[in-house]
Amino acid sequence: IKRVEQVRDVFVFCIFTGLAFSDVKDLSPEHLVKDNKGELWIRKNRQKTKIMCNIPVLPVAASILEKYKNVAECTGKLLPVFSNQRMNSYLKEIADVCGIHKNLSTHTARHSYATSICLANGVSMENVAKMLGHADTSVTKHYARVLDQNIFKDMQKVNSCL
C-alpha cells in the first residue's frame, strides 16, 4: 500500500536523521548541503527552537531522499509527509500489523536516532545535542536516560515487518 510505504520511509528517514515531525515536513532542497569532502548534510533551523541543526545524511536516509527525488507530490519538499495525526495513526496501524506493542509515533523516531543510532554507538552528548538542535545538553540528557537496548530490538521487529 503506497501510503504505508511512504509513512514507513518518512519514519525510517527520521530514525536516521533525528528530525522532528515539523522539521521533516518542512524539509526542502535548500536544506541539503555538500561539504568540501562531498558529504551530504542537512542544515536547517529547527522550527520549534530556531536553533541550527547540522546532521550528516547517513546512507539509509540518502537512499530515501533519492527514492522521492522526482515524485510529483513532493513538489518543493524532499519527502511526502502526511499530517502528524495521520502519520501517527498509520504508524499505530503498522505496529498492530507487525505485532509491535510499543506506541510508535513520529517522535519515537527522533528518540531512536538519539539513543540507538547515536548514543549507543558512542557519539558524544554534545554532538547529539548539536544534531538534534538542542541549545545545550540538558534536554539531550533526557534521551540518554531512556537509552535501552530494547528500543533497538523493537526497531528490528519494525524493520522485519516492513
Where are the model-predicted features located?
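Basic, Lys/Arg- and aromatic-enriched nucleic-acid-binding interface segment
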Residues: 1-21
